[in-house]
A protein has these predicted regions:
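Long, amphipathic, Lys/Arg-enriched alpha-helical "connector/arm" segment
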Residues: 90-117
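Short, basic (Lys/Arg/His-rich) helix/loop patches that form interaction surfaces
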Residues: 112-115, 210-254
Length: 295
């Protein structure tokens, strides 16, 4: 009944929705409801007033998702119950993103052949910087994912199961080629990135953040306590750069492997170029000098 496969949801999201739906129907039974037609507005309100699930999270997102997917089973009743569930907006923290200066410094570190980066580290950093791939997908890349002749990079995302096929930029292809021809161990493994020591197992996603931190140290960026250094910074950067260059949202979504266009909202919040176009000038309004005085 639950159409999670069509949404590309993580298994954890599916489990949460099912758990919260089960809790909801059990609570309805405790209130005397024997079938879906018996569920009243007052019963739903009473349930929601209990606050949170056992894991401390709001019940609304998972429950709403379940009810929405069940509508085809009983359109009238499930739409009725779905309409009784209020929309819950969750406040999100401001997302750190790479500034133009930080991006230039990171790029310079990647291109500086005199620093201590290995060819593998350089290839990993280049992939992240120019494609916005997740760390798990970088670690899971296989040799067959790279089509140097036709300039294509293709893989299936681990998180969503979405197949991604994007152009392989020359700078990315060159970094991968250098690693494969001059540093990659001789191995029958289908995976692209391997460990340096025998038996040369594929790297794991846990190795990627360490590579990013090393490059940032060499670039001299994000050295303050609390500065974010995760690979998600690069997904944010790729989406923002594409938006600033007027790339259509569907193309950005396809590049990042996003099924839901709304997933771009948090990335595009840093598209300063287009945000400025929406701003209103206040030059027509007289402002006293005292307003700008700093005491």
């Amino acid at each position: 009944m639950f159409c999670s496969g069509k949404r590309g949801l993580k298994e954890s999201s599916v489990r949460r929705a099912k758990f919260e739906a089960t809790s909801f129907f059990l609570a309805m039974q405790d209130q005397g409801c024997q079938c879906i037609e018996d569920i009243s507005e007052s019963a739903v309100i009473h349930y929601l007033r209990t606050g949170t699930s056992n894991n401390g999270r709001t019940k609304l997102p998972g429950l709403s998702l379940f009810m929405r997917d069940c509508i085809p089973q009983n359109p009238y009743e499930y739409r009725r119950i779905y309409g009784l569930i209020p929309i819950k907006y969750v406040a999100r923290k401001t997302i750190q993103f790479l500034t133009v200066e930080e991006s230039i410094a990171f790029q310079t570190a990647l291109e500086d052949l005199s620093n201590t980066l290995s060819l593998k580290q350089r290839a990993i950093g280049t992939l992240l910087f120019y494609t916005g791939m997740r760390s798990c997908d970088v670690a899971n890349l296989q040799l067959e994912s790279i089509d140097l002749q036709n300039g294509i990079l293709q893989f299936t995302q681990i998180k969503t199961g979405v197949a991604v096929r994007i152009p392989l930029l020359p700078v990315v292809g060159n970094a991968i080629y250098d690693y494969c021809t001059m540093e990659r161990p001789s191995s029958d493994s289908p995976f692209l990135f391997l460990g340096e020591f025998a038996p040369h197992h594929p790297i794991t996603s846990k190795a990627i953040p360490w590579v990013v931190s090393k490059i940032m140290d060499l670039a001299g960026i994000r050295t303050n306590k609390g500065d974010r250094r995760g690979t998600h910074l690069f997904r944010h950067r790729v989406a923002t750069v594409m938006a600033e260059n007027n790339v259509p949202a569907p193309v950005i979504s396809a590049t990042l492997g996003q099924k839901n266009p709304k997933s771009l909202d948090s990335y595009l919040s840093a598209d300063i170029t287009h945000l400025r176009e929406c701003s209103l000038s206040i030059k027509e309004y007289a402002i006293r000098e005292e307003v700008f005085d700093i005491v």
